[in-house]
């Protein structure tokens, strides 16, 4: 969201965790992980800052944090699995990863669905960490879908802050 919000931002808290661990702020990372697990919705998703809508991207960024903290705080396992399973449930038969709401996205020039490529690494990492090969298989299917259908757009570095390049 942006600075006018005076609330904790779950998505950002999720991707802070690996950085906090890298810089030695273990206790803070553990606290963030505990908070994130406590606000996870029953279906496995995490919602926007206002807790109104579930988002694929936000959920995936939180999963990155839970993957990073898992060796230190194995109690996150259930939340990690629920989140991954929810993400898998957002994949269409052809391999497109769709979010239930695009309310915060604006038009395609502001936020492209291709940012979902950046959601695949936590599935791949969780697959290895939890011995769940179906997570990696699903992530590869999504990558194949976007590469097959959006190759030109993916290669256009001027769309949505280079997220896609980080994902590939």
Where do the protein language model's features map onto the residues?
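Glycan-recognition and catalytic cores of secretory/periplasmic carbohydrate-active enzymes
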Residues: 1-168
């Amino acid at each position: 969201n942006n600075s006018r919000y005076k609330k904790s931002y779950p998505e950002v808290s999720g991707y802070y965790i690996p950085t906090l661990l890298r810089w030695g702020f273990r206790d803070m990372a553990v606290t963030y992980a505990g908070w994130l697990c406590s606000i996870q919705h029953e279906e496995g998703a995490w919602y926007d800052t206002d807790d109104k809508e579930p988002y694929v991207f936000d959920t995936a960024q939180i999963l990155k944090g839970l993957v990073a903290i898992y060796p230190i705080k194995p109690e996150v396992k259930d939340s990690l699995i629920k989140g991954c399973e929810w993400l898998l449930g957002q994949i269409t038969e052809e391999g497109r990863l769709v979010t239930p709401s695009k309310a915060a996205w604006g038009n395609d020039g502001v936020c492209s669905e291709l940012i979902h490529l950046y959601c695949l690494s936590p599935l791949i990492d969780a697959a290895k960490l939890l011995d769940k090969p179906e997570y990696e298989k699903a992530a590869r299917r999504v990558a194949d879908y976007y590469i097959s259908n959006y190759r030109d757009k993916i290669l256009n570095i001027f769309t949505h802050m280079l997220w896609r390049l980080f994902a590939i």
